[in-house]
Amino acid sequence: MARHARRAEGRRRRITGFAAAGALTALLGGAALTGAAFADDGHWNHTDGTPCSKHARACVDLAHNQAWLIHDGEVTRGPVGISHGGQGKETPTGDFEVQWKDKDHRSAEFNDAPMPYSVFFADGGIAFHEGNPQNPSAGCVHLGHDDAVAWYADLEVGDEVEIH
């Protein structure tokens, strides 16, 4: 009986060992596939000097009050100083697309306030536009005049915007 118990225990060890080896192989193989997926997706490869992927056309770093324009993974303008939403009116973070543009937009929400060179990218009227980069906004990304003109000229409807 003791001999039979030892053989059964040996089989269990071999089976457990094979199962562990198989699980490890599957895990490592999955990691390799996952890595390839990230690389193909582009969100793994960031544009140098920015927190954004090479697919982004406009990139914003809220923590450092900076923004960039990017084309084919290369910075074409920036970093430039910006301001963004203040407390309770934060600029949304995430991946967005340019929805529409209006060179002479006026705010329906804030007493017809001018929002020149507006490039809208998020629900709720959130846009890049000319504004004082020293003052917080109601959620938009304020750019100085020359930068607002450049953002307006460079970005097209459907372009990817990343806000970090």
Which role does the model predict for each range below?
Residues 2-88, 92-95, 100:
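Cell wall/extracellular polymer interaction/catalysis modules
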Residues 3-5, 22, 40-43, 50-55, ...:
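Exported/periplasmic cell-wall-interacting domains
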